[in-house]
């Protein structure tokens, strides 16, 4: 059992960059989601940490799995939902600050239900980190 179990929705981020010379909007791809960020930070600090979530069977889901494995986050409790995408969001910037637009309705993580949660893993975790 992991010392720290992080449960929440990872989302692929597209963060707006300054316009290019031709005026087009450009976006930098990244990984977002409070629980994913916390899991990575804990793993980098030497903690035994696992993610509990669902990802789509898509490039974004594969990207998160690769990131967590590279960072030392246990992915044994990460489900793949072949019928739903991994959530994404966009960050845009203007004179009033930055603004978020989420596209997560029907995402793999949003479809998790109580019956999908492994009770033994939840009971065995020293810390359960949630976001929502």
Regions found by a protein language model. Name each.
Residues 1-73, 112-114:
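Glycine-rich phosphate/adenosyl-contacting loop at the front of the ribokinase-like
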Residues 48-132:
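Conserved N-terminal subdomain of the carbohydrate kinase-like
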């Amino acid at each position: 059992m992991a010392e720290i179990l992080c449960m929440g929705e990872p989302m692929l981020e597209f963060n707006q960059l300054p316009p290019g010379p031709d005026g087009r909007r450009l976006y930098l791809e990244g990984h977002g989601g409070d629980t994913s960020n916390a899991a990575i930070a804990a793993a980098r600090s030497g903690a035994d940490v696992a993610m509990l979530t669902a990802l789509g069977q898509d490039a974004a889901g594969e990207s998160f799995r690769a990131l967590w494995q590279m960072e030392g986050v246990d992915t044994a409790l990460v489900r793949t939902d072949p019928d739903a995408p991994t959530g994404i969001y966009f960050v845009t910037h203007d004179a009033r600050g930055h603004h978020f637009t989420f596209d997560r309705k029907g995402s793999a993580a949003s479809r998790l239900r109580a019956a999908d949660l492994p009770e033994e893993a939840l009971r065995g975790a020293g810390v359960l980190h949630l976001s929502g």
